[in-house]
C-alpha cells in the first residue's frame, strides 16, 4: 500500500492535475485536496503564503493515522513513471517515525516528503503548524529553524529525519552550480536517475509551467507506455 498526497489552490489546480495526478502511476491511493486561496496570487512568500503552507500541514494532519506509507508532493512536482517502485523500496528501509525530505541544497525541502502516516508524524505536523504561526514563518523555514535550534541545544527532533537522494528527487538547485540561484530560462538536462522533478528555485507560476513543460519534453522515461 502506497499513498500519494498533494493539495492545491485555484492558481495551482492545472499544475496539480497535469504534473501530479495524471502521472500518479501505480499508487494505491491518491489524495488531491483543494483548499481556499488564502494567498491571492499564489506566488512564493506573497501575502497569505504562510497561511497556504499551514493548509498543507492541515492536509497532512487530516490523513488517517494508519501508518500507511505516504508520499507528499507539492503541486509543482512532475512525477516520473517508476517513482512508485522506488518509493516502495525506500519505505521498506525506513524507521517507523521517519520523515524523508527532499534536498533543497541550502536546507531540507518540505515540497516532497516520504513518511508513514502515524500518530507521531501527525504530532510533528501540528508542531510545525504551531511554530509557523508563532514565528510567522512558512513551514519549511519553521522546519529549518527548529532543526538549527535542536542541533544547538544537542536535542532531537520528534521524528527521525532523513534526506532523499538528489539524483532521484531533482530540482534546479540540485543540478545547477553552487551557490543556487533562481532559474531564469537556462537549458538543463534531467538526470537519467530522476523520478520526480520539483519546480522550486523558480520564480512565478508562469515560469514553473515553462520549467515543467521542459521536464516533460526532456523526460528520459517512456511515460506514454505507462497506464494509470
Please identify what each model-predicted range represents.
Residues 9-12, 38-40, 77-78, 105-107, ...:
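Short, solvent-exposed loop/turn segments at secondary-structure junctions
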Residues 1-68, 119, 217-228:
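N-terminal anchoring/stem segment of glycosyltransferases
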Amino acid at each position: 500500500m502506497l499513498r500519494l498526497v498533494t493539495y492545491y489552490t485555484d492558481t495551482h489546480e492545472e499544475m496539480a492535475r497535469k504534473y501530479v495526478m495524471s502521472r500518479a502511476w501505480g499508487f494505491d491511493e491518491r489524495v488531491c485536496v483543494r483548499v481556499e486561496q488564502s494567498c491571492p496570487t499564489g506566488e512564493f512568500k506573497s501575502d497569505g503564503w504562510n497561511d497556504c503552507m499551514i493548509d498543507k500541514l492541515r492536509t497532512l494532519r487530516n490523513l488517517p493515522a494508519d501508518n500507511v506509507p505516504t508520499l507528499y508532493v507539492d503541486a509543482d512536482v512532475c512525477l516520473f513513471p517508476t517513482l512508485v517502485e522506488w518509493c516502495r523500496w525506500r519505505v521498506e528501509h525506513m524507521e517507523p517515525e521517519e520523515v524523508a525530505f527532499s534536498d533543497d541544497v541550502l536546507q531540507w525541502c518540505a515540497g516532497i516528503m516520504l513518511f508513514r502516516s502515524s500518530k507521531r508524524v501527525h504530532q510533528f505536523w501540528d508542531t510545525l503548524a504551531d511554530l509557523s504561526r508563532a514565528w510567522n514563518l512558512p513551514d519549511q523555514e519553521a522546519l529549518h529553524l527548529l532543526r538549527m535550534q535542536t542541533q544547538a541545544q544537542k536535542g532531537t527532533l520528534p521524528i527521525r529525519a532523513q534526506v532523499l537522494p538528489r539524483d532521484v528527487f531533482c530540482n534546479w538547485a540540485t543540478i545547477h552550480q553552487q551557490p543556487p540561484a533562481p532559474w531564469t530560462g537556462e537549458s538543463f538536462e534531467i538526470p537519467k536517475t530522476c523520478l520526480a522533478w520539483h519546480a522550486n528555485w523558480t520564480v512565478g507560476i508562469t515560469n514553473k509551467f515553462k520549467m515543467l513543460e521542459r521536464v516533460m519534453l526532456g523526460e528520459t522515461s517512456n511515460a506514454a507506455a505507462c497506464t494509470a
